[in-house]
Every structure is written in structure tokens, then in C-alpha cells.
């Protein structure tokens, strides 16, 4: 049967939490529940589709396989044996036994192929600049020997007498009549007496193919690229599914990214921070010159306009934020230590407040705090730099 992307079905992002997935399923299940939509086959199909998506995405192991290989990674584990199967044991905490089975349907036509999912890891540089990557994906195509029928050429394919070719059987469950996958034909609606020797009755052959995927500039973690018609083959007369390539950007040694903004931490010498100057800053397009004003403090941030990431949806280019961190000198010579001591002593005079405004402001605040305690009969004064 046709299988859309499970995240798309539940209307959630690929990074959705377990709670968000459960909430999304509950919303869709309530909307399309057969009891609320009697004799509405489209609603029944959407209910089944949402239930199958939830079965996979609510299971950590199945979700991991799906994220890596798409529907091919969970074939045979999702939606098999009707919705009353073991994979739906946790549905009871959402709606109870009312969701014990699947619902459906009339006669089925040729079903489009399943969508495929592929996770592609790219560097930050390639994500920002854009690139083209060749990927090799597993897929399945119609068997050329039997044209997808699953039967040995020249043999007959019979309509399943149990479900009359529908692929599902109606079962009474409490007050509801529900549909389950036909146990005789396993949902195919047909019976093959002499299986095709090439595909062993599957109707498909498993293979792989290499595709060139164009990565647009500005893609980010979780973005998806759709390649229409590059999914699995459908039943005879039906189109292929689609291929969804999900982007995962590698961590960078220098830059961090938030949307279209890049962040970079840079070491700064004590002398440059005090006296001012310039420094070379790495960007994704080479070096940029950053002016450092005198008196720069550790943790101070500077903006390099237009040095960030281009938006994937517009011509806007983000900025880069540089945060400087002043390095403390180590392994000083005796002469250097004496010079630093002399420098420090020179700051302790009457102009101390002018040279070290933050330190002086801090001690003023502490002094005022203890004076307030004394006025309220609090602690005695203690010796300290604020006295």
C-alpha cells in the first residue's frame, strides 16, 4: 500500500519528542475515528495511516530504523496483521479498546510505492555553501519476470475467496464492525499457487541505486529534500513513491550555528584587550579583520555583519557573533612578573576607580550591603577592601 512519510502523516517534525508524537496521533485519531465518520472510507484510511505511523514512531527501536532507512527499515513490522497486533499494545492508554483493530475498506486499486527515507550527513561548510552529493540507497523494483504479480509466468493468480480480493475482512468487535488484514492472502487480495522463481512470489526484486542529490545553500539539521518518484516501485500501473533525504549537519570545531547566525569563540591577549587593536577572525569564507576597542572585557561580543549563513528560502545572509575570552599569561619570567606587580600597584592609587570600574563598583556594593546590616543592628564590620 502507499506509504507517506510517517512524520508528515502525524504533522510533526523529525525531531518531535515522544510526547509530541503521542499528542499528534491522539488529535488525528479523534478526527478520523470511524465512529465519528460512519461510511467514510477516506477517514478510515487516514485513521489507519495515522495508526501505522504512530506504531513506528512511538517505538524507539523502530523509529531509529525508520529514520535511517525509511519504510524499508520497518517493512514487516508496521501495520501487519491488522491494528489489533502486538505493535499497538500501547494504544490503550490513549483511547482504550476502541482502537483495537483497523478500519477499512472497499476494493483497492493499484497502490503507489512506499516513500523512502535517507539520512545524509554533511559538513557545516557544505550546508552553508550548498553542494551535490551522490547517495546509494536500497530500494525495490517490480520483478521483470512476473511483472509484479508474484506468480510464475504462465501460472494463474486467483482472487482470494476469503476477502473477495479486498485484502481485508470485517470483524465484529463490541459495538463496532472493524476491518483486519485478511489472514488468507495477507492483504494482497490474491492467491498465487505457483510463486515466481525469480522473486519467490514477492513481485519485487531488492536492489540499490545511486542518485545525485543537490543540497541547497543554507540547509540545517532536520531539513528534508524530496526527490519525487525515487521511492519504491508501486504495484503494476501505479507510480513510484518519493525519496526524502533528511539533512544532518556535522558539529564544527570552531563554529556553532543557530538558524542563520554563526557563533565563534576567540582568545584575546591581555594587552590587546587593554590597549585595543585588531585581530584576524576565521569565517567560512576566509579571514575577517575585527577591531578590538581599548578596555574590552572577557565575554564581550562583537558582530560581523553578513558573515553568517544565507537563508535557504531568501537572499538574506545572517551575521557572525564573535565572543572574546581574555587569556591569562602563564610561565612568566621573573622580569615579566615584576613588571606585572609594578603595573598592579600602579592601579591601586586614587585613580583605582577609573582603572578598574567593575571591581570598584563591586566593592562599593558590598560596602553598602554591610553598612545596611549595621544600621539594622546586624553583623559587626569585618576587615576587607571595602573599609
UniProtKB/Swiss-Prot annotation:
Predominant cellular place of this UniProt entry's protein: cytoplasm
Cofactors (names): Zn(2+)
Zinc finger (CR-type) stretch: 130-208
Residues reported to bind Zn(2+) 1: 143, 146, 196, 199
CXXCXGXG motif repeat start and end residues: 143-150, 160-167, 182-189, 196-203
Pfam families, sorted: DnaJ, DnaJ_C, DnaJ_CXXCXGXG
Extent of the signal sequence: none
Cofactor note: Binds 2 Zn(2+) ions per monomer.
Gene Ontology cellular component list: cytoplasm
One of the GO BP terms on file: chaperone cofactor-dependent protein refolding
UniProt domain comment: The J domain is necessary and sufficient to stimulate DnaK ATPase activity. Zinc center 1 plays an important role in the autonomous, DnaK-independent chaperone activity of DnaJ. Zinc center 2 is essential for interaction with DnaK and for DnaJ activity.
Function (record text): Participates actively in the response to hyperosmotic and heat shock by preventing the aggregation of stress-denatured proteins and by disaggregating proteins, also in an autonomous, DnaK-independent fashion. Unfolded proteins bind initially to DnaJ; upon interaction with the DnaJ-bound protein, DnaK hydrolyzes its bound ATP, resulting in the formation of a stable complex. GrpE releases ADP from DnaK; ATP binding to DnaK triggers the release of the substrate protein, thus completing the reaction cycle.
Protein name listed in UniProt: Chaperone protein DnaJ
Organism: Hydrogenovibrio crunogenus (strain DSM 25203 / XCL-2) (Thiomicrospira crunogena)
